[in-house]
From Swiss-Prot:
Nucleoside triphosphate pyrophosphatase that hydrolyzes 7-methyl-GTP (m(7)GTP). May have a dual role in cell division arrest and in preventing the incorporation of modified nucleotides into cellular nucleic acids. This is 7-methyl-GTP pyrophosphatase. The lineage of its organism: Bacteria, Pseudomonadati, Pseudomonadota, Gammaproteobacteria, Alteromonadales. Keywords: Cytoplasm, Hydrolase, Nucleotide metabolism. Belongs to the Maf family. YceF subfamily. Transmembrane segments: none annotated.
Amino acid sequence: MKFNLVLASTSPFRQQLLQKLMLPFTCVNPDIDETPIKDETALALVKRLAEQKALAGANLIDETSVPQIIIGSDQVALINGQIIGKPYTVDNAIAQLSSASGQSITFYTGLAVFNNANQQMISCVEPFTVHFKHLSTAQIRYYVDAEQPLYCAGSFKCEGLGIALFNRLEGDDPNSLIGLPLIKLIDLLSQHGVDILSQAPECSIN
């Protein structure tokens, strides 16, 4: 199967993860409203936003004679029943990590794969739980100053120094924490007829 693969994200972290599959791909920036709907659950939110990003990405690319397969992804974290997102500021990051100290946080990553040739959307939500150590204020401040995780849900980068914050990780795919669960992605691509191992050499790039 020949296809063009598109990542509907400009996140360097998601790009680095997708590169592990050794498939050429292009990136587009889906500009969508990410405001939660009233009473929307974390699972419903990330699934909806992942699908909207994939559809928005499809609208940003030129039509071609080969199928375009667009990947959308979104992530939120849930602690004590409350959705938390990206901190954006140092103070917010410190507050998030202070709340997480000694607690368990579940991350929900919505993943959507859209084939514009047949208009088929396949999506799922992948959970992953991190169990935090009891952290002192000094440790939290040191970490935030060192790694500046201001654009990461939950205020940490597990691929870096953030790994020192945890007692235990619990889930099927640690890539979920970085924003793109590769095991599930491979499964969704296969449902679109894309076999990563046997068909990767046949794919093309815009």
